[in-house]
């Protein structure tokens, strides 16, 4: 009888543990990185949070000439000069509905998020999800990009974003615990 009781207790504890794991928040770390800088930050966030990494990719990859912000005819300059322009995505993440928390990372372009971030956000239903932006930049802060995203998508559950230039794993741990 004692053995049966012990087995029942073990089975119940196992069921409780499995149920708790299923109810925990699932995290997606989605990022766009034209040069690899934002990708490094995204990978650190995945290490710290245990989230799933997803690269936001344009259907047509950016080449160096596309990123020349001094050239008004470059692809990035043209995209950023038109707030309604939406570059096509190569793919969409599978099972977005399974995620509760979504980090969205990007380089700052013209003091804003690149237009492909708008494409990504508009490609699926983010209702009820916690959205946490992060960015990298050669000289701008994330504040204007974050403000624009909040204003453009007011129904999303935005959390405070973070600029992660040269961030370490410890920096990410401190930020994600806030």
Predicted regions: what they are:
Residues 52, 127, 156-159:
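Secondary-structure boundary/capping positions in well-ordered alpha/beta enzyme cores
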Residues 32-34, 56-59, 105-108, 134-137, ...:
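Active-site-proximal beta-strand/loop segments in catalytic clefts of secreted hydrolases
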Residues 20-100, 111-113, 170-177:
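N-terminal beta1-alpha1-beta2 submodule of the flavodoxin-like/Rossmannoid cofactor-binding fold
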Residues 157-178:
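Glycine-rich phosphate/pyrophosphate-binding loop and the adjoining helix
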Residues 70-154:
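Helix-loop-strand module that forms the ligand-binding subsite of alpha/beta enzymes
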Residues 1-23:
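Bacterial Sec-dependent N-terminal signal peptides
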């Amino acid at each position: 009888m004692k053995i049966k009781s012990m087995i029942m207790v073990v089975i119940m504890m196992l069921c409780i543990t499995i149920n708790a794991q299923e109810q925990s928040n699932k995290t997606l770390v989605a990022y766009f990185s034209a040069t690899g800088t934002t990708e490094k930050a995204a990978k650190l966030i995945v290490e710290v949070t245990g989230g799933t990494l997803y690269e936001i990719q344009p259907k047509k990859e950016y080449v160096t000439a596309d990123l020349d912000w001094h050239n008004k005819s470059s692809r990035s300059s043209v995209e950023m000069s038109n707030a309604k322009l939406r570059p096509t995505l190569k793919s969409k993440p599978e099972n977005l509905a399974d995620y509760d928390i979504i980090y969205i990372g990007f380089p700052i372009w013209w003091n804003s998020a690149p237009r492909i971030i708008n494409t990504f956000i508009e490609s699926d239903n983010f209702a009820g999800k916690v959205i946490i932006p992060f960015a990298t930049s050669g000289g701008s802060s994330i504040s204007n990009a974050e403000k624009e995203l909040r204003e453009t998508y007011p129904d999303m559950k935005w959390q405070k974003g973070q600029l992660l230039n040269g961030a370490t794993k410890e920096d990410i741990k401190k930020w994600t615990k806030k």
